[in-house]
């Protein structure tokens, strides 16, 4: 197996092997552009490094030095030679651009003897010693993890002693003294002398790149961006080009288009007599790239021609790094540039208009996840730089929120009514908190994962939420908490970012969401190519209307229980729960029925004839009963019972494992009158709206938590008898569908039997994931961190569908269901319906639709189109 490739041996299609940087250096070499030559150590060598117990094997080391010899032949220089040394840079380069990977090491190959000869021969001793002190600092920081700050302190001390403000004002003698001090600092921190042998330096740097693939920052970034650990990183070893040789040398970065707005103009900065990170370090003010035209017109002309060549070649906006050495231009890197979501849409549309790409390619260019930032407010970028970050939780629902801390839903509601902006901070939220959640700018919880109550409800409402911040020390009773060493009480100011999970002290200004015309164009192209329909999970007319505005083609999940928690309804529900007889229950349900009917009518109207799937009552009854003494007394008085009797009823509802207890279809089996009432409300609402709007409505009734076909058959009979009677009495031609959620593994395993009784399956992947993995979505956050660290799991299975296990059940149930009912309609309504990788899986399995939170509808539409286009290839 070949582990090392010269740049002249690769191309852009080898990024899996050579990494993004290596593949693009090879491609630029192939295009005849001025690239300092070198070689790439492959991602497979990185994988082997970990397999061999974090060692570089002898055969790979031999191959590295064979390629060093080839570099010597190409450059006419010799690695480790005093008279004519080959100096190199070492850079990491995974196949996907990854912040958090190892920083670059420049000027590798220098030692005290080499630098003395270099100073003499070049006639530029300042340059030689500047290179050496930079190398010592970079190697110490990057390879040996001695922090930059120690060396920066020594530089600042030297500048103060010499009475200068800039590094470039230090003389050769000053820099020589700095190099000596740096080596002393290195020895004091590491306990050994700085390595003089270039071979040891090179192998140390290569190992450091491989090690950085497994550092905490890289692991977090990989998990957030769905990058597998197995990919590994490549290493690029490249001949040095020096931008610090004087005023005819320099270094810079540039974009072929504006990465913030997408406007078509060259944008970037450069700095003369500089190297490495000087451009972005902020010590000296860089010049705009347009100024290079005045400083070096020929170099500028060559550079702009190269920019045009690269953008035309890659058919995308390029982010490039370059160095000028004595008026000679060298290209060090090109890659598809990172950009804002707004810029991504504009660039894609402009490239189509310029004839450089097709609309299909434009659809594939956009990362669906980035659309979130277009649909929600974000923090002002400049203000964020100065913000005081105090902690981090899970990025549960995107957007930015800033306001005063409140600890109860009631307080949130009151503050909102008084015109105050608040952030609701809770240990965890429950359905009782809905009103307060609606009134809050954002929600912060100590417990719970990506599919906890807080996360799911917040996403549905489009409200910012950070969940599972276990660093918070909460004192709910006294309304205070501590985070990042700071105590927050009621009224303290806080800001949370639901897109990153970051939490800040104080109020940060926000920028409003802005949807542009390019958004509509991209979405229209996506709709042209996708096969999957996209529905929404919505419980209120407001959510349904927002989802329609964002392109939803119906409601895939309406959770009826969320309608019961408003004050005028909860009393009737509690009355029903505490009834002694079926007659009493029916009387209580009769009060709820018109309210439910009104809700359903509003949803049917908002959906304008598109399908609406209504899930019958699902949660265990204990979630509806009062917990406060005053509420218990109120309920007792209204029912003519004693407080003690009500408390006994509440106690009788207690379950050791309520999520696997008396809930879902089991409620309808034990209390059929609940299913009858909900059926009447569904059918009457459909009839009323179909007559009012003169449109055909086909109600879709979904029975939850079915694990045995006889359960479905029993509840379905109740539904059909009730519905048929109403339709007959109303003398209307109306059809309706009865289906079930597949959320219990047994339902997936017996889907062929269940399909005979169902018009549709909707995979409830939140519960299906819980029951397949056997852990709670609210509690898993406690141990998932350890599982990520130990490489047991790479992703949160509640955020990204587990395709090996849960996915296998979905696939099996789809196949079995279609065997006995070829016309069965298949969809997914768990939170995975808005995750791009899960949507792609749904497309490949052959589902008919996905359903997700309203604000994730555009993400699902784009992801579905990308899945369809990819499957054509």
Explain the meaning of each model-derived region:
Residues 1-387, 413-416, 420-423, 430-435, ...:
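Nucleotide/phosphate-binding sheet-loop regions of phosphoryl- and nucleotidyl-transfer enzymes
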Residues 392-432, 483-521:
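Extended, non-globular alpha-helical segments
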Residues 206, 375-407, 520-536, 543-546:
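Flexible inter-domain linker/hinge segments
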Residues 328-330, 427-438, 442-444, 450-456, ...:
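Glycine-rich phosphate/ribose-binding loops and adjacent secondary-structure elements
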Residues 39, 446-448, 467-470, 558, ...:
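Short beta->alpha connector loops at strand-helix junctions that form conserved
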Residues 91-92, 515, 525-873:
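Conserved alpha/beta-domain cores
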Residues 236, 406, 423-425, 444, ...:
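Structural motif
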């Amino acid at each position: 197996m070949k582990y090392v490739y010269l740049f002249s041996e690769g191309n852009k299609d080898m990024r899996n092997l050579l990494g993004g940087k290596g593949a693009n250096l090879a491609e630029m070499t192939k295009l005849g552009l001025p690239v300092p030559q070198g070689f790439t150590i492959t991602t497979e060598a990185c994988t082997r490094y970990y397999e061999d117990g974090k060692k570089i094997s002898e055969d790979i080391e031999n191959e590295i030095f064979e390629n060093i010899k080839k570099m010597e032949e190409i450059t006419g220089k010799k690695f480790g030679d005093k008279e004519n040394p080959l100096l190199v840079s070492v850079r990491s380069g995974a196949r996907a651009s990854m912040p958090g990977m190892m920083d670059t090491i420049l000027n590798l190959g220098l030692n005290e003897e080499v630098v003395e000869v270099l100073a003499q021969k070049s006639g530029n001793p300042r340059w030689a010693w500047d290179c050496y002190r930079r190398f010592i600092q970079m190697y110490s920081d990057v390879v040996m993890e001695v922090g930059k700050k120690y060396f920066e302190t020594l530089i600042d001390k030297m500048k103060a002693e010499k009475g200068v403000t800039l590094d470039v004002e230090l003389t050769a003698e000053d820099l020589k003294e700095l190099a000596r001090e740096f080596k002393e600092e290195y020895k004091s921190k590491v306990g050994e002398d700085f390595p003089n042998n270039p071979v040891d330096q090179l192998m140390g740097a290569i190992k450091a790149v491989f090690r950085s693939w497994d550092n905490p920052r890289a692991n977090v970034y990989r998990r957030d961006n769905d990058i597998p650990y197995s990919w590994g990183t490549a290493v690029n070893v490249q001949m040095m080009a020096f931008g610090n040789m004087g005023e005819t040398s320099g270094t810079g970065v540039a974009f072929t288009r504006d990465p913030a707005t997408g406007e078509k103009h060259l944008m970037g900065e450069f700095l003369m007599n500089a190297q490495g990170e000087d451009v972005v370090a902020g010590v000296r003010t860089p010049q705009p790239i347009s100024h290079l035209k005045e400083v070096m017109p020929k170099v500028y002309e060559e550079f702009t021609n190269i920019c045009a060549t690269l953008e035309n070649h890659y058919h995308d906006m390029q982010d490039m790094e370059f160095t000028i050495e004595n008026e000679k231009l060298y290209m060090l890197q090109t890659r598809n540039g990172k950009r804002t979501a707004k810029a991504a849409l504009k660039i894609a549309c402009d490239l189509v208009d310029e004839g450089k790409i097709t609309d299909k390619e434009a659809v594939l260019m956009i990362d669906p996840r980035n659309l979130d930032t277009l649909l929600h407010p974000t923090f002002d970028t400049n203000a964020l730089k100065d913000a005081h970050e105090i902690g981090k939780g899970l990025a549960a629902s995107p957007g930015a929120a800033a306001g005063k801390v409140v600890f109860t839903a009631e307080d949130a509601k009151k503050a909102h009514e008084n015109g105050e902006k608040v952030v609701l901070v809770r240990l965890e939220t429950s359905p009782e908190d809905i009103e307060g959640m609606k009134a809050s700018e954002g929600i912060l919880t100590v417990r719970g994962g990506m599919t906890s109550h807080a996360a799911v409800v917040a996403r549905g409402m489009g409200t910012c939420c950070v969940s599972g911040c276990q660093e918070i020390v909460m004192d709910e009773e006294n309304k205070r908490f501590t985070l990042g060493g700071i105590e927050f009480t009621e009224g303290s100011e806080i800001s949370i970012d639901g897109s990153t999970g970051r939490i800040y002290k104080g109020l940060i200004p926000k920028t409003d969401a802005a949807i542009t015309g390019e958004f509509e164009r991209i979405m229209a192209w996506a709709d042209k190519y996708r096969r999957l329909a996209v529905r929404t999970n919505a419980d209120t007319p407001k959510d349904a209307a927002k989802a329609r505005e964002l392109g939803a083609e119906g409601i895939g999940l309406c959770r009826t229980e969320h309608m019961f928690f408003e004050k005028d309804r909860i009393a009737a529900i509690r009355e029903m729960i505490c009834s002694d007889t079926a007659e009493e229950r029916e009387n209580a349900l009769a009060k709820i029925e018109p309210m439910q009917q009104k809700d359903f009518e509003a949803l049917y109207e908002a959906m304008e004839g598109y399908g609406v799937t209504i899930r019958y009552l699902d949660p265990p009854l204990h979630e509806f009963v009062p917990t406060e003494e005053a509420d218990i007394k109120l309920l007792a008085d209204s029912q003519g019972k004693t407080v003690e009797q009500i408390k006994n009823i509440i106690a009788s509802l207690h379950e050791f494992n309520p999520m696997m207890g008396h809930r879902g279809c089991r409620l309808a089996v034990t209390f059929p009158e609940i299913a009858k009432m909900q059926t009447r409300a569904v059918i009457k609402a459909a009839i009323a709206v179909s007559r009012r709007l003169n449109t055909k409505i086909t109600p879709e009734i979904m029975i939850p938590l079915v694990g045995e076909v006889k359960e479905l058959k029993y509840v379905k009979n109740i539904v059909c008898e009730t519905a048929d009677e109403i339709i007959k009495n109303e003398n209307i031609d109306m059809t309706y569908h009865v289906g079930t959620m597949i959320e219990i593994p047994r339902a997936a395993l017996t889907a062929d039997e269940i399909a005979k009784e169902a018009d549709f399956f909707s995979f409830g992947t939140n519960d299906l994931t819980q029951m397949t993995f056997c852990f709670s979505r609210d509690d898993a956050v406690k141990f998932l961190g350890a599982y990520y660290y130990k490489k047991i799991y790479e992703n949160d299975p509640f955020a990204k569908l587990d395709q090996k296990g849960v996915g296998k059940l979905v696939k099996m149930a789809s196949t079995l269901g279609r065997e006995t009912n070829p016309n069965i309609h298949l969809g997914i309504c768990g939170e995975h319906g808005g995750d791009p990788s899960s949507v792609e899986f749904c497309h490949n399995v052959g589902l008919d639709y996905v359903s997700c939170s309203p604000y994730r509808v555009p993400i699902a539409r784009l992801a579905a189109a990308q899945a369809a286009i990819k499957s054509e290839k």
